[in-house]
Curated annotation (Swiss-Prot):
This is Aminodeoxyfutalosine deaminase. A divalent metal cation binds at residues 61, 63, 206, 306. Binds 1 divalent metal cation per subunit. GO terms for molecular function: hydrolase activity, acting on carbon-nitrogen (but not peptide) bonds; metal ion binding. It catalyses: 6-amino-6-deoxyfutalosine + H2O + H(+) = futalosine + NH4(+). Belongs to the metallo-dependent hydrolases superfamily. Its EC number is 3.5.4.40. Catalyzes the deamination of aminodeoxyfutalosine (AFL) into futalosine (FL), a step in the biosynthesis of menaquinone (MK, vitamin K2). To a lesser extent, can also deaminate 5'-methylthioadenosine.
Amino acid sequence: MRIIKPFAILTPQTIIQDKAVAFDKKIEAIDTVENLIKKYPNAAVEHDENSLLLPGFANPHLHLEFSANKATLQYGDFIPWLYSVIRHREDLLPLCDGACLEQTLSSIIQTGTTAIGAISSYGEDLQACIDSALKVVYFNEVIGSNAATADVMYASFLERFHQSKKHENERFKAAVAIHSPYSVHYILAKRALDIAKKYGSLVSVHFMESRAEREWLDKGSGEFAKFFKEFLNQTRPVNDTKSFLELFKELHTLFVHMVWANEEEIQTIASYNAHIIHCPISNRLLGNGVLDLEKIKSIPYAIATDGLSSNYSLNMYEELKAALFVHPNKEATTFAKELIIRATKAGYDALGFEGGEIAVGKDADMQLIDLPEGLTNVEDLYLHVILHTTKPKKVYIQGEEHVRE
C-alpha cells in the first residue's frame, strides 16, 4: 500500500485539496493523510506539495507501425500524404523494429499515457504491445476495396485477430479495425464485423477524415477518383455511407476523425454505442480541417494523437495544447477542463478499461506532475496543466510506478 499527498488531485471532474490517495493495484481510499496513515499504518507515504495527481491519459487511436517516420512523409494535404505513404511504406516499416517499438511504447508511458488503442495493419507490433506495461486495445485492421482479394485479406485479418486473442488479459484486449468506407469492400467489412459481434470486440474505423473522402463517397469524384483509377482501376466507390454505417449498428465503435461527417451521419452515429476520436494535430498536418465540436455534441468524444505517420509526437500533452488552440471559439479555462476529461475518463470509457478517474475502486492508473509555478487561482489548474506540462514526474499503471527518465 502507498499513500500520496499532493497539492491537489484532479479527479478529473473536480479539484480536491487537503486530501491524499491510498492505493495498491486499485485506489483504496481518498481522505486526509492523517486518516489514511491511521488506516494503513504500514503504507509508504509520499508528501509532495509541489505536485498534482491526475489520472493517466488514454490515447485511443495511434499507429505504432510507422513510428520510424520523422520527415519522410509529405504533409499539407491528405492525398499527397497518402501517395507518400504508399511510396515510402516499404522503407519505413522495417525501420521500426522491436527496439524501436519498445522505445516508442516506453516514451508513451513516460509522457503520462497509461492506456492506448493500437491500430495494427500487419501484426508486427503485437509482441511489443503484449510486453508493454500499458493497457492496450489491439485493433487488428482490415483493408481492401477489391472484391477479388477479399478472401485473402479476410484470412490475413482473421489470423492476426486470433493470434492477438490468445494473449488477452486484464491489460490486453483484441479488437477489430475497419480502415475506412473508401478502402474496405462492403463484404470484407461485414465479415470482419461479424467477428467483432461474435466475440464482443471493440471496433475502430476512420470515417470522413478528408474532403477527398467526402467527395469520392458522395459523387465518385474529386482527388480520390484519380487515385483509385491509378492504383486499383476502380471508377466508383465500393460503399455508400448509409449502408456502410448500418454495419456498425450493434457494435461499440470508435469513429475516428469525423471532420467531414454530415448531419445525417452524425445523427445515425449518435444512435449507436459510439465514441468519436478527435486527432487535432493529424487533421491539421494533413489539411483536413477542424472537427466541429458543436456539431458532434450528441456523441461522446475522446482525444488521440493518431500515429507518427501524421504527427510529430505521441505525447498527449502536445495534443491537448493543439486542441486548445485549434478551437478558438471555446473559452480557454472551461475548455481546458473539458480536454483533460476527454483525455482521461472519456478515453478510458472509449477503450473499455477500468480507470481514467481518481476514485475509490478504480485502477490506480495515475500520473504525478509538477505544480505550475506561481499559481494564484486553483480553478485555472486545468489550463496551466496543459500549458506548462510536457512530462509527469511519475506514472502509475495499476499501482506500478514508472519514474521519469
